[in-house]
Amino acid sequence: MDLTKLTAHELKDILSNKEVKAEEITRAFLDRINLVDNKLGAYLYVSEEEAIKKAKEIDGKIEKNEELKALSGIPVGIKDNINVKGMQNTCASKILQGYTSPYDAHVTEKIKKEEGIILGKLNMDEFAMGSSTENSAFKLAKNPWDLERVPGGSSGGSAVAVAGCEATLSLGTDTGGSVRQPASFCGIVGLKPTYGRISRSGVVAFGSTLDQVGPMGKDVEDCALLTSAIAGLDKKDFTTADKEVPDYKKSLTKDIKGKKIGIPKEFFGEGLDEKVRKSVEEAIKVLEENGAEVKPCSLPLMDYALSAYYIISSAEASSNLARFDGIRYGYRSKNFKDAQDIYLKSRSEGFGDEVKRRIMLGTYVLSAGYYDAYYKKALKVRKLIKDDFQRVFKDFDAIVSPTSPTTAFKVGEKKDDVMSMYLSDIYTVPISVAGVPAISLPCGMIDGLPVGLQIISDYFKENVLFNLAYSYEQSVDFYKMRADF
């Protein structure tokens, strides 16, 4: 039995039945990482000794017949912008190279409390800015389905770790699609929860009104399991909602009779690959066969979402990244004349091109004379987009669309074409701007590459997403796909 190919719920079953030890599971994954990660590039840091130590502790509890917790013995990878005490937290940037976190993020605390085994920190686009993980300062992450293609981004390492069987579960962050798009490209399940459903405390900020931690897994049940473990109120993050977290496992049923699904025409227009369109339309038919009522709908303001997103997120990034100045921690230039020179050279040398591009854009739209014309207007557009979604959700339980207009593109294909790269998030960005939840799951294969189906629902209706996603998933076999790597 290849333990690395099993889902989290399958591992939980054999662990609780004492068919396998937690240490055996952990060593299987560490061996897998040592075997393949030099080609896949999922990990920036592996915590081998600590992982084995935790596994042995769990085995001791099992021997005493103590009750297992939600994630007991399950290997988890953490994106390298989410703090884990004692591990590096570089955000895949030269400016934070060598930085070790002195504390745990709230989501990390919750994973540890539920006895998940953290294997290490995962590769990403620098400061979560990118759609291909080509912006990492340290190494490329590659798609397990085709090593010449990108895994998506910015949570590319998180997707690769799960798809490449280097972790059972992983955490990413999603600001404009950074969990859903790599989940689509790598053929796994990824959730962007409602803004405020999961704490951002201890997550390095990119766009503070957009950032959300998102769980990733091999199937919908795994994703629901991890969401249940990490969701809920956190007093350290005032944006988290004081709303009870439902038992998402109860939503995992094929019964979706009477559920109303809208198909927005704006997500099926120009730029959508015809083969992707066909795969998504076939998935919609399956949902209809399972009892859902499917009707067309319209979200006319979606064309403005991408522009609003890049103005708002870049403005917030320019403010958030001002703290990285070469003084208290992180990279400091060795050649400087005075304090101002330290700031200038440390940031110029420490940040990559995409990060500098977004800082400049953000500083520009916040500057005198342009604030009203760009930033203030983008906030107004954001409000209108939220209203657009609320109007549609009065008539529908969910909206269905492609996750990305294409399958995974080749490494280097869009690296120097900024607009083309930004457009790869055209179907995920509107959801982030509105703050509503969405899930991506595999719905087909095109020329050996996975296609992603995106299901979107109203605020705090993750249970609806899990219900619809599970119903579709269990009606097809795409969730059983494993990259032959």
From Swiss-Prot:
Gene Ontology MF: a single term: glutaminyl-tRNA synthase (glutamine-hydrolyzing) activity
Keywords: ATP-binding, Ligase, Nucleotide-binding, Protein biosynthesis
GO process terms (BP): translation
GO cellular component terms, A-Z: glutamyl-tRNA(Gln) amidotransferase complex
EC number: 6.3.5.7
Family statement: Belongs to the amidase family. GatA subfamily.
Role of this protein: Allows the formation of correctly charged Gln-tRNA(Gln) through the transamidation of misacylated Glu-tRNA(Gln) in organisms which lack glutaminyl-tRNA synthetase. The reaction takes place in the presence of glutamine and ATP through an activated gamma-phospho-Glu-tRNA(Gln).
Quaternary structure, from the entry: Heterotrimer of A, B and C subunits.
Protein name: Glutamyl-tRNA(Gln) amidotransferase subunit A
